[in-house]
């Protein structure tokens, strides 16, 4: 299967990612979910957490972003993720990602 879906992670300052993908996983308000090409259209509120963008069928090549929450629009052909903050954590260890997530959550709680 060679189908892909266009993924964009958009912040107020830039497009953090624009790439074709085989699958994307992210944290919605009701839990983790995945999106494949030809997905049914939907709009979902996102929690702070990881967005994993899988590039190949074996799910070995991925881009991982830590986002501050936001909203995603999904159609059969594209996924737009709008967020205030998107940090590329693809090459970080799990411990480093956990630290960044805690820092982000603290920043978000301080803003409220």
Swiss-Prot record:
Keywords attached to this Swiss-Prot or TrEMBL record, sorted alphabetically, are: ATP synthesis, Cell inner membrane, Cell membrane, CF(1), Hydrogen ion transport, Ion transport, Membrane, Transport
CDD domains per the UniProt record, alphabetical? F1-ATPase_delta (cd12152)
One GO molecular-function annotation for this sequence?
ATP binding
Which compartments does it reside in? Cell inner membrane
Q: How is it placed in the membrane, per its record? A: Peripheral membrane protein
Q: Is Transport tagged as a keyword? A: yes
- Which is one Gene Ontology cellular component term of this protein? proton-transporting ATP synthase complex
Q: How does it assemble?
A: F-type ATPases have 2 components, CF(1) - the catalytic core - and CF(0) - the membrane proton channel. CF(1) has five subunits: alpha(3), beta(3), gamma(1), delta(1), epsilon(1). CF(0) has three main subunits: a, b and c.
Function summary = Produces ATP from ADP in the presence of a proton gradient across the membrane.
**PANTHER family per the UniProt record, alphabetical:** ATP SYNTHASE DELTA/EPSILON CHAIN (PTHR13822), ATP SYNTHASE EPSILON CHAIN, CHLOROPLASTIC (PTHR13822:SF10)
The family line of this record is:
Belongs to the ATPase epsilon chain family.
Q: What is this protein called?
A: ATP synthase epsilon chain
Specify the species: Rickettsia peacockii (strain Rustic)
